[in-house]
Design a protein with these regions (language model features):
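Membrane-proximal intracellular helices of multi-pass ion channels
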Residues: 1-480
Length: 480
């Protein structure tokens, strides 16, 4: 392990976070929240000083392999979460350090699960920071760093591969740094467009900004106790549309910018993604029709919740925990499906389910006709065995972590649905689950131990498991 270069990269992260903390400080200044302003300025200063101390370490070698990439990624997300939790503790918004860490990790991983029973009494600076963590984490913290800094040659690709939450689009342009800038350009543009649509619907500037942050990062922190239930149908439809748009592979948007419309529309994953959404909306709309006054109202709530869950955003337009069993079962299944690979959404991803389906079809064909060669193809391209193997290993690790987490959080004594959906909601970065962790409830009743388990799940889910598991391997920490 090249410790020096890992620590050097972490110093850049601390510098970036120090700068980003100035934005909620500005919000506190605008609203006259002087104590909160002081806390954000102090936290920013501490982050900058820590960054300066780490930056003094000079790497003797520029060697940067995948293990450095995995270690940097996992440590980076842990570090920004620790620093990001400080304002919650010092302002008294969440005095318990474990609870503050849970809230911050939930923000950066764009999970949106909260321990707070109510948020409307929080200072505006804290509300801004909660939602802004979604926007920072949505594309990936290290992708943001790569868009700003010319790092060592090997670190570009290995960081991009190790940090899975952002789009994997290193083939768009030759330079990885240029790719990162393109990604953030698209990300920023979509955020601004949504912000303008929300303003046009009568939402105030502050609320529009927080909504755009949460939607863009596919995070679910609300700034109202009932999430989006009290907003107009227009606002709910705008949020629905943009949640779904941010769940699309960003490759498609880049192709649209290049006017390669046919190629963008030919993506099997994107087509499957929209097909799943349409099917789920249709089933749920029919199932909940009797609960609402009109078909249009039922359709709106069904579309909102399907878009929210499959993209792993986690906003709610109603208490879907009160829906019929079939509707809730569909939503739970969507928790595992997730959004497209290369989007800001979480979950297992549509592409992996497509690959599993195609691999199953291949195995069935060869079971019936052993001599038949049945290659697996995605978008017309042959899928190599290494990709299939990696997918299988990911699923095995996912099942193991899910089962272990489910058993551990069950020690708190909650019912099975609560425990199952709490793990599903955190490992898939959804936010709300059912029963005691439903859309109008929170995770505050869990013990500190259970919260730590769920914190691990949120990080593992956002980083697609491997970077977090690498931290527990002794071989990864051996020096050269």
């Amino acid at each position: 392990m090249n410790y020096a270069i890992v620590l050097r990269l972490l110093s850049y992260i601390l510098y970036c976070e120090a700068a980003l903390l100035l934005l909620p400080a500005m919000a506190s200044l605008i609203y006259g929240e002087w104590m909160v302003l002081g806390v954000f300025l102090l936290t920013a200063a501490l982050s900058a000083v820590a960054g300066a101390l780490l930056h003094r370490i000079k790497p003797k070698s520029q060697i940067f392999y995948m293990r450095e990439g995995f270690a940097t990624t996992a440590l980076c997300w842990l570090l920004i979460s620790v620093v990001g939790a400080v304002p919650f503790v010092l302002t008294g918004s969440i005095p318990n350090p474990v609870g503050a860490m849970f809230e911050t990790v939930s923000g950066f991983t764009t999970t949106g699960a909260s321990i707070l029973p109510g948020v409307e009494g929080l200072p505006n600076g804290i509300l801004f920071w909660r939602s802004f963590t979604h926007w920072i984490g949505g594309m990936g913290v290290l992708v943001f760093l790569l868009s700003l800094l010319p790092l060592t040659g090997g670190s570009h690709v290995n960081l991009m591969k190790a940090e899975s939450p952002g789009p994997q689009v290193d083939k768009l342009v030759p330079k990885v740094q240029s790719t990162a800038k393109i990604l953030y350009g698209i990300y920023f543009a979509l955020t601004v467009v949504e912000f303008c649509f929300l303003l046009a619907g009568g939402m105030n500037v502050f609320d529009s900004l927080l909504t755009a942050f949460g939607t863009a990062g596919t995070g679910g922190f609300g700034f109202k106790n009932d999430s989006f239930a009290s907003f107009s149908p227009y606002i709910q439809w705008v949020v629905t549309i943009f949640m779904i748009l941010f769940g699309v592979n960003f490759n498609a948007y880049f192709l649209l910018l290049l006017r390669r419309f046919r190629r963008a529309a030919s993506s099997e994953e994107v087509r499957a993604y929209f097909a799943i959404i349409l099917a789920a909306v249709a089933v749920i709309t029919v199932n909940i029709r009797s609960l609402y006054g009109t078909f249009g109202e039922a359709l709106r709530h069904a579309a909102f919740q399907v878009g929210s869950i499959i993209t792993t955003t986690g906003f709610s337009s109603c208490d879907f925990d009160l829906w019929p069993t079939l509707a809730k079962e569909v939503l739970v299944l969507l928790m595992f499906v997730g959004a497209c690979a290369g989007s800001t959404g979480g979950g297992i991803k549509v592409s992996r389910f497509l690959l599993m389906g195609k691999t199953l079809g291949k195995e069935l064909k060869q079971a019936l006709h052993p001599q038949v060669v049945a290659p697996v193809r995605m978008d017309g391209k042959l899928v190599n065995h290494e990709t299939i193997r990696t997918t299988n290993v990911f699923l095995a690790a996912y099942i193991f972590i899910f089962a272990a987490s489910f058993m551990l959080v069950s020690l708190d004594g909650f019912d099975m649905v609560t425990n199952f959906t709490s793990v599903a909601a955190t490992l898939n970065n959804i936010g709300p689950g059912l029963n005691q962790v439903g859309p109008m409830m929170n995770f505050g009743a869990y013990s500190n131990f259970a919260k730590l388990v769920l914190i691990f799940d949120m990080l593992a889910g956002r980083l697609e498991i491997f970077p977090m598991l690498v931290l527990f391997l002794p071989d990864a920490w051996r020096r050269f």
